[in-house]
Amino acid sequence: MTTHQPNRRQFLSAATAGAAMITAAPMAFTASRTSEEVITGEGDYKYRVIHDWPMLPDKYTWQTTHNVAVDKAGNLYVIHEGRKEQADHPSIFVFDPERKFVRAFGSQFQGGGHGIEVREEGGEEFLYVAAYQHVKCFEKMTLTGETVWHKRAPMESGVYSPGEDTNKTATWTPKGFLPTNFAFLEDGGFLLADGYGSCHIHRYDKDANWVSSFGGVGEGKGTFKTAHGLWVDKRPGREPSIVVTDRAHGTLQTFTMDGKYQETLPGYGLPANIDTYQNLMLVPELKARVTLLNEKNEVVARLGAAVERVNEIKGLRTQPDQWLPGQFVHPHDACFAANGDIYVAEWVGTGRISRLERVS
């Protein structure tokens, strides 16, 4: 039987009943206000929330912000989906640590901008960018936007329909290629999640040659419903492992470094991606919260949680006047800054980037 991959709106709808069960438990308190500050979190993990942190020039507009990454200088890189019809509008924006706009580029990803990561190679930093919808590609770029290489569907994997590497239409099926995010390997290679297409995790070598794949569409335990985000977990005291967000199943799955299934961690509201800092793992959940786990994968804080509110107010993502300070709507990605602060990108119509500054 052919299994068809649901699109994002379908899984948000399908997940509503399950997500209603994921409420603001004791660990997920509502943000509190201290004088003019908005604080979220608890115990040793409290953060000052600054919504709409970057200062975007008036000539540009956010068009559904998707992912964020930080370079060694502390600059923030933001990718948004962009509108296909605005082909000259950039999809990637760069801001300095003081919130100021630095540059913009990446119009080639308009209408499909999705994943972005920064990686240092031989003393130089590069961007890795994944695009879905009709764009259907991934690229390595310099920090100023020059293309190093450009890739499309790995046909040698045997996963895709004939011609998928030249197909310019979005194919939301297990035979289609709609890449979402990256993770980096110690040998210079990388992993690419085909989260909205085949749900395979593809391994590439340091020269961007396809090596192998694992995963695919299925019901879990090594297969996925939406293999949306991933990370190589190298936190102290743990054996290195690959962690994949199986978003539509509401779980994280862990794998050995050669792609063998280990375990499933349940209890997430559409987990979208992963980052780590010291002993912490960060999991942005599309269902209105950001979760922090310790080195034992125990939940230590849930930040900006507004699960019940998002469940109750239909179409909240398009109603900015209804958003509450310190609460998230749809966190789609998050990453740590060098000092442990957190940037959050939300899948909302107007786009929104928040900075969480740690206060305890």
Can you say where each PLM-predicted feature lies in the sequence?
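N-terminal secretory signal peptides and thylakoid transit peptides that target proteins
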Residues: T2-A19
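Beta-strand-rich domains and repeat architectures in extracellular enzymes and scaffolds
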Residues: H51-E85
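Surface-exposed loop and turn segments in beta-propeller and other repeat-based domains
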Residues: P54-K59, F105-F109, W149-T173, V211-G222, ...
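Beta-rich, blade/repeat-based domains predominating
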Residues: K59-A73, F109-G123, V159-G189, E219-P240, ...
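A short loop-to-beta-strand structural motif that recurs across blades of beta-propeller domains
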Residues: H89-F93, C137-E139, H200-H202, T251-Q253, ...
